[in-house]
């Protein structure tokens, strides 16, 4: 009997951080703080990018897509997490778990590809500036964004469907604060080798290949930056690139730790804390890092706050 058949009438018990009751109040503030920052920062980027014509460029098109992703991704996880951190009985309905699994997987996978698209955009802007407008035309940008969203959806359908077919044999105590594939695999009472193989293959496609391509792009960008004669301009470019790469490393690195570790060596308690980084922290960092040193965005924000936009 599959997970779907036997679990439809029973909630999942999310053990979450119940082993650390004193820490739950701190985690509640942590999650709430980062969730609110994510909403404010990313909504601001979407609004400004839409209202200010000078920002109607490929860079801000992708950044707006990333902001929308981050809002939806954290919203699929944070509210349920906040509720469970506040109540003694930490549960989620079977339907809620299925919805959370499909949505978070789709959005997370989409972001993995979209970050690679953004690195490609930066590579062409820096290394091929004379051809940038021709190459990064609106049609190509829309195609790249569409591929990101559709590939994320496909990944979710494969990942989640394979996982939800597993029999649980009455075990509904999920040792996590969200419904996530590695934690659900541990509930299965049958051999999960095939599922782990699917998890590995899909994870390589989404969390190993994209950061490798991003690294190559930034390698070429670094070479181009080194040819800049102005020390100040070179320092500014390196500072911006290092900030972008920091977010990329945190996002992909934490996902790789959770999804590509062998199941027998996976420390679930440690994994839960690491999951907080790519579910709560990086969606907050993205708008800060990608716009902090951007004069156009800061000028547009100033016009918005002064009512001139």
Swiss-Prot record:
Cytoplasmic side of membrane: 50-57, 121-139, 220-236, 293-309
Glycosylation sites: 5
Transmembrane region(s): 26-49, 58-79, 101-120, 140-158, 196-219, 237-259, 273-292
Cysteine disulfide partners in this protein: 97-189
GO BP terms in the entry: detection of chemical stimulus involved in sensory perception of smell
Keywords of the record: Cell membrane, Disulfide bond, G-protein coupled receptor, Glycoprotein, Membrane, Olfaction, Receptor, Sensory transduction, Transducer, Transmembrane, Transmembrane helix
Family stated for the protein in its record: Belongs to the G-protein coupled receptor 1 family.
Protein name per Swiss-Prot or TrEMBL: Olfactory receptor 2G3
Name of the encoding gene: OR2G3
């Amino acid at each position: 009997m599959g997970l779907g058949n036997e679990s439809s009438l029973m909630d999942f018990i999310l053990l979450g951080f119940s082993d650390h009751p004193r820490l739950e109040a701190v985690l509640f503030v942590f999650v709430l703080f980062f969730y609110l920052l994510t909403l404010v920062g990313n909504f601001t980027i979407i609004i400004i990018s839409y209202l200010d014509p000078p920002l109607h460029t490929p860079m801000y098109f992708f950044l707006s897509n990333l902001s929308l992703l981050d809002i939806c991704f954290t919203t699929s996880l944070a509210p349920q997490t906040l509720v469970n951190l506040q109540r003694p009985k930490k549960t989620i309905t079977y339907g809620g778990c299925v919805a959370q699994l499909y949505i978070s997987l789709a959005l997370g996978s989409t972001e993995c590809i979209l970050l690679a698209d953004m690195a490609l955009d930066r590579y062409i802007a820096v290394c091929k500036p004379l051809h940038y407008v021709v190459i990064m035309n609106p049609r190509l940008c829309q195609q790249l964004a569409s591929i990101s969203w559709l590939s994320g959806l496909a990944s979710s359908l494969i990942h989640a469907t394979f996982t939800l077919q597993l029999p649980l044999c009455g075990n509904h105590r999920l040792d996590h604060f969200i419904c996530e594939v590695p934690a659900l695999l541990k509930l299965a009472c049958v051999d999960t080798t095939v599922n782990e193989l699917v998890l590995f293959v899909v994870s390589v496609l989404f969390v190993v290949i994209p950061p490798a391509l991003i690294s190559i792009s930034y390698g070429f960008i670094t070479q181009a930056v080194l040819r800049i004669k102005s020390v100040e301009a070179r320092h500014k470019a390196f500072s911006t690139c290092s900030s972008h790469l920091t977010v990329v490393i945190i996002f992909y690195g934490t996902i790789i730790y959770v999804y590509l570790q062998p199941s027998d060596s996976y420390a679930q308690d440690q994994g839960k804390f690491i999951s907080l980084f790519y579910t709560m922290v990086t969606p907050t960092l993205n708008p800060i890092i990608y716009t902090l040193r951007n004069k156009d965005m800061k000028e547009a924000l100033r016009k918005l706050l002064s009512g001139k936009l």
